[in-house]
């Protein structure tokens, strides 16, 4: 079963967005390679701001030290979070849009452990573990905005 306990002494150190550029431009968008302790969602937001992305879709895989997933409770109108440690990010997919002038990252993912047990859900936080995490970002021409749907209090992508 996936580890839900802290296993490293360096866990109290803050995760970080990379001080150096960890991506290259491609014909369709960007290829990003993140390294140990990088904040995946923060790095994607930083890319969106730096490169002035209108919107984008992305897929990724790699190794994570910490993955926090949330399952949205429509009664409480909030995510129920669960954190897992030291796992393979078997798959991640998501979108980059804008909300209140800032990048809004929406991602879902699946992580697995050495016994191939897997869990997944809405990504609330991802910290890269030992090794790397690779993300292919496909840029879109149209700027997309995310807004809170008042009925369910959840962020919804507008077209």
Regions found by a protein language model. Give the residues of each.
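N-terminal intrinsically disordered, cationic/polar leader segments
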Residues: 2-105, 110-159
């Amino acid at each position: 079963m996936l580890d839900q306990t802290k296993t490293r002494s360096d866990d109290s150190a803050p995760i970080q967005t990379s001080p150096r550029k960890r991506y290259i431009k491609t014909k369709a968008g960007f290829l990003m390679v993140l390294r140990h302790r990088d904040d995946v969602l923060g790095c994607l937001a930083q890319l969106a701001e730096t490169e002035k992305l209108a919107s984008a879709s992305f897929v990724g895989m790699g190794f994570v030290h910490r993955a926090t997933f949330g399952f949205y409770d429509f009664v409480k109108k909030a995510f129920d979070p669960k954190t897992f440690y030291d796992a393979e990010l078997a798959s991640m997919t998501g979108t980059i849009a804008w909300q209140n002038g800032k990048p809004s990252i929406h991602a879902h993912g699946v992580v697995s452990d050495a016994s191939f047990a897997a869990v997944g859900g809405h990504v609330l936080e991802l910290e890269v573990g030992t090794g790397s995490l690779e993300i292919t970002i496909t840029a879109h021409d149209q700027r997309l905005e995310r807004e809170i749907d008042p009925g369910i209090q959840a962020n919804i992508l507008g077209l």
